[in-house]
Amino acid sequence: GKSILIHSGTGGVGLAAIRVAFAYGLDVFTTVSTDEKKNFLLQLFPQLKAENIGNSRDTTFEKMIMERTRGKGVDFVLNSLAEEKLQASIRCLGHRGKFLEIGKFDMEKDTKIGMSAFLKELSFHSVMLDKLFSAPDSMKNLLKKMIDNDIKSGIIKPLKTNVFPATQVEQAFRLLASGRHMGKV
């Protein structure tokens, strides 16, 4: 079967990606920053293996991926991590792997990717999620149709949300800044 590494598994994009990956039969690996977040994922996704959850705060996830895949690497990476964690994520890809970058930090910083990565015939793609709003109507309609189909089939389900009243906007920003939130704020 195919495998995927999804970084920041308890964020909104990460949670949705894990759900979709399982629905399509992928072997899922993910990263989180705390044991609390790891436990949250294990409760939410009983099919997720504890040993497939790595640390998003350093590059130790690379060793975990290579051990768990017996040196093969994963078929897909959904990346939102930066700097040395970006480079480690690239190294996690197997032959002809596909890398999907959704973080802006390294793009805006013009971080270099070594050409040796392409010896494994890798594919790199970037998605600027905020630019989807200005995408052509044909693309937005196609995405909407795909999402509607996955909602009807039960693949896509509502995400965990933390809603704050307007009077607690400061607390909401503090939660976001702390990195302790799970799901959408």
Model-derived segments and spans:
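4′-phosphopantetheine-dependent carrier domains
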Residues: G1-K184
